[in-house]
Amino acid sequence: MGKEDKTHINLVVIGHVDSGKSTTTGHLIYKCGGIDSRTIEKFEKEAEELGKKSFKYAWVLDKLKSERERGITIDIALWKFETPKYSVTVIDAPGHRDFIKNMITGTSQADCAILIIAAGTGEFEAGISKDGQTREHALLAFTLGVRQLIVAINKMDTTKWSESRFNEIIKEVSNFIKKVGYNPKAVPFVPISGFEGDNMIEPSPNCTWYKGWNKETASGKSSGKTLLDAIDAIEPPTRPTDKPLRLPLQDVYKISGIGTVPVGRVETGVIKPGMVVTFAPSNVTTEVKSVEMHHQQLQAGYPGDNVGFNVKNVSVKEVRRGNVAGDSKNDPPKGCESFNAQVIVLNHPGQVGAGYAPVLDCHTAHIACKFSELIEKIDRRTGKSVENNPKFIKSGDAAIVKMVPSKPMCVEPFTDYPPLGRFAVRDMRQTVAVGVIKSVIKSDKTAGKVTKAAQKATKK
């Protein structure tokens, strides 16, 4: 099986700040990944000079992260590694400033989350305590539709590979993830040392008692020994090619001699030359002349592809970042009057009531929206109502809220088009809440602009 034929999957790595996420991720990328040996030698030398030899794997990741944060575009291959079955991209590791926002508006939906738990005495308890980040990250992953989970119990070397400690942690973590919404039976629990490399890629001689992990899902049972095995046993994602087209615009360029070129990622459906597309909420309809990716003409752009496409008779002023392109003949996108969403308040210093109007980041749109009505407060895990029309909600609460955008905006219910149905609420320079859209009241404006090119193409 050639490298090119492997299915791509996206992983997100979650866990408490000192659980060893960087070291573990660094180790996988280092051993199975896209970092060439020259780069590694350079990093190792730098680490040694700084007396950070022990820090080798995390150092690899730190270097990548700091370059990423400084805006140096890194070869994305550095964040990739291979398993026998998959080509894996680590889409984000927390600790990154905008982790929560990235996870929501993020370039891609994670197919699976790896929760890293530190086994050390006191460490485990701190990570999983009431206010722990671990709980928040796990809840976020679940709320945002990441349905597969792997638990890696790290730093087992610091517990002298104690079987009883491992079992104690499994018991606690099973209860914990059950409360979040995951089924522990479907989750592999793997004891590892991200630093020493035990059980990461090859079974470790240090835990002879460990018989391996098992998981049982709707599609059957699987088992294995290592973290790599567990990643290889992730169920392959279905990519939404059969849904109608949704393509949120990241930018719109004017290119001399070519014209207007919107750019963005195909989230669902397929975009092809000759197709007549409608942009929402600007309500402009026109023909796609050509589609390209990395300066190559494409016959079609599929979910996950970052494409540029050339449109006729449309000026740069008429379509902009945050607009969404769709097929004019197949459930075309529309602007919305309002939408109802399940909102979870993460960290807001005060109370949130009706009238609150923060900025929402939803796909590529960045628009202020008013919480016009708090419909009901709900239990985060079950979704059941606990109070009708609450006056306020505060950190930790979840509620169904009616939201009204301050200017035209295109969103969709999460169940129909997931990437257009989740959002981050930004205020005070941080993510204060996240939301999942339940229903949308679309604005049925009278016909907008239909270009000559579109009329011609429709007649064909």
From Swiss-Prot:
| Annotated positions of the N6-methyllysine modification | K3, K31, K317, K391
What GO terms are given for molecular function? GTP binding; GTPase activity; translation elongation factor activity
* Source taxon at top rank: Eukaryota
Location of region: G4: 154-157
Return the annotated region ranges for G1. 15-22
What keywords does the record list, in alphabetical order?
Answer: Cytoplasm, Elongation factor, GTP-binding, Methylation, Nucleotide-binding, Protein biosynthesis
Q: Where is this region: G5?
A: 193-195
Main role? This protein promotes the GTP-dependent binding of aminoacyl-tRNA to the A-site of ribosomes during protein biosynthesis.
Q: According to its UniProt record, which protein family does this protein belong to?
A: Belongs to the TRAFAC class translation factor GTPase superfamily. Classic translation factor GTPase family. EF-Tu/EF-1A subfamily.
Per its record, how is this protein called by name? Elongation factor 1-alpha
